[in-house]
Each structure stands twice: as C-alpha cells, then as structure tokens.
Amino acid sequence: MPVLKKEIELSDGKKIWVRQASGMEKLPIENIQAKIFRKTRHFGADPAEWTPEQNEEFADMLDEAGGGMADQIQAWIPNCVIEPADFDINTLTSEEVRTILSFVRGDTLEGAVPLG
C-alpha cells in the first residue's frame, strides 16, 4: 500500500498537508512494540480482552522502552507535516497532535490520497 497524504484543517482554520509515516520510519518503534507485545503475551493474544491493569502495564512498558505515544509523536510528526514547508509544529494543540498522529500511523485513512 502506498504512503498516503491528507489535508487536515486545524482549529484556527489553517490547513496543512500531512503524510503517513513510511515503513522505514515506523520500523524502530514497531520493533519496540513487538518486543513488548511478546513480553506480555501471557496477557492473551487479543489486547481488546486485556484488563485495564494489563493495558496500563503494557503502555508503561512501551513508554519505558521508547515506543509510546510521545515517542511516536516526536519521531513521526515533524517529518510528516509536508505543507506548508515552514509550518511550526510547536503551534499544534494536543488535540491536533492526536488527530495528526492517528493519520500518520495509519489509524484513520478517510480523505487520504496517494503521496506520489
């Protein structure tokens, strides 16, 4: 599947173009996530069936290993906001960061078009 891009409207009405993180960009964090998942396989194969405590332990382990949400944001968002070229990512609100991250990592694809 190709890397996609999408126009996202910010809370102040500005629009930015964002692309998904590539496989090569995602690889280091995905490796961390896989290692932590293997360490917690005794929780069960389906994370949707884990207890809240198990989910919290998993999230804490991800954070400690460098694969948590903050790590994803820092690794991917600066490179994935592609237009305008001079956009200052430090002006994004927390809600905007979460919206962008959801697209960048491939959770939401609505309205996306191929990058090329």
List PLM regions with ranges.
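Short, surface-exposed, charged amphipathic helix/loop patches that serve as local interaction elements
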Residues: 2-4, 19-116
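Short N-terminal binding/cap micro-motifs at the start of the first secondary-structure element
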Residues: 16
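Short acidic-hydrophobic surface loop/beta-edge motif
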Residues: 4-13
